[in-house]
C-alpha cells in the first residue's frame, strides 16, 4: 500500500508518498493539528457569517448542502437539502454525500483531486455527533 499526502496553498502544493502506515498516521495527525483545525474554524466562522463554500458541484451553507441532480435530457437541477436530510459515506478514495430519500441526488468528492474534503467530512461528522440545525453551532457560541 502506498499512502499519499497532498498539501499546499493557493499557488503551490507538495505531494508525499509513504509506504509505512505508522509514519503516514503520525504525519496526518500533526498536519491536522497544525492546519486542519484552523481551516475548520475558518469555514465554520464563514458559515456563521453567511458565506457559502463550493466543493465540486455542491455548495455548502450553514443550514445544509445544495446538490446537483444530473439529468440525461435537459438542464441539471439544483436541490437544497438540510443537514438532517443528508447521509454520508466513503468509497474508494472519495467522500460522498447524498439525500437520504433520493439515491440519485448525491455528490462525490475525491480526496486527492479536491481541496479540503477531509475538513468538510470532519465538520459534518462532528456536527452529526453533536447535533443542531446549523453547522456553525460547532463553534459553541
Predicted regions and their residues:
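Short aromatic-glycine motifs in intrinsically disordered, low-complexity regions
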Residues: 64-80
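Polybasic phosphoinositide-binding surfaces of eukaryotic membrane-targeting domains
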Residues: 55-60, 65-67
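Acidic, Ser/Thr- and proline-rich intrinsically disordered linker/docking segments
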Residues: 1-56, 78, 84-141
